[in-house]
C-alpha cells in the first residue's frame, strides 16, 4: 500500500476497501515484516507482480518476448512467509454491472530452484492471462519502462505539463 498524496482520496479509498473486508489492513509497501507476519498467520497479501517497480528488487526476464524488470518479491514472500502463491484474474462484465473474479489454483512447486525461473514462470502466467482477455489489461501501465543497462527506452518521453 502506498498512501495517496491527496488525503481525501486516500481516506475514500481506504474506507472503500475496509467496507468490503473488515479484516483488511493496508500495509505500507516498505513494511516487509508486517507482510511476513500476515502470511505466517495464514492470511493473504496482495500486490501486482506485473508492475514495473524498477531494477532494485527485480530481474530481467521475458514478458511477451521483451525483457521486463520483474520483481523477485513473489519468490521471497512465498519462501519466507511459508505461503502459497494463488493467482487470480478479474474481468469487467460487458454490461458494466461489475466484475467476475476467478481464483486460480495455487502455483505448484513454488518457489522453485531459482528466483529467475520463478520470475519467468510468473511472467508466463501473466502472458496467458492477458492473452485470454487482452482488452481487459491495463495497457496504459508502462510495463517495460525499466530497461536492462545499455538498452534504449521503449516509450516516448512524456512532455511536462
Feature map (PLM): residue ranges:
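Non-catalytic C-terminal accessory region of glycerolipid acyltransferases
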Residues: 30-161
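Conserved nucleotide-cofactor-binding alpha/beta core module
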Residues: 1-43, 54
Amino acid at each position: 500500500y502506498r498512501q495517496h498524496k491527496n488525503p481525501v482520496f486516500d481516506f475514500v479509498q481506504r474506507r472503500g476497501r475496509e467496507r468490503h473486508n473488515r479484516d483488511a489492513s493496508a500495509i505500507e509497501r516498505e513494511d516487509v515484516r508486517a507482510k511476513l507476519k500476515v502470511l505466517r498467520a495464514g492470511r493473504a497479501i496482495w500486490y501486482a507482480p506485473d508492475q514495473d517497480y524498477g531494477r532494485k528488487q527485480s530481474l530481467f526476464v521475458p514478458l511477451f518476448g521483451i525483457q521486463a524488470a520483474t520483481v523477485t518479491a513473489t519468490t521471497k514472500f512465498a519462501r519466507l512467509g511459508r505461503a502459497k502463491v494463488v493467482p487470480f484474474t478479474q474481468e469487467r462484465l460487458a454490461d458494466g454491472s461489475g466484475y467476475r473474479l476467478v481464483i486460480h489454483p495455487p502455483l505448484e512447486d513454488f518457489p522453485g530452484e531459482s528466483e529467475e525461473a520463478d520470475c519467468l514462470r510468473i511472467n508466463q502466467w501473466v502472458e496467458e492471462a492477458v492473452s485470454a482477455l487482452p482488452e481487459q489489461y491495463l495497457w496504459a501501465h508502462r510495463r517495460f519502462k525499466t530497461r536492462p543497462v545499455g538498452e534504449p527506452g521503449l516509450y516516448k518521453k512524456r512532455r511536462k505539463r
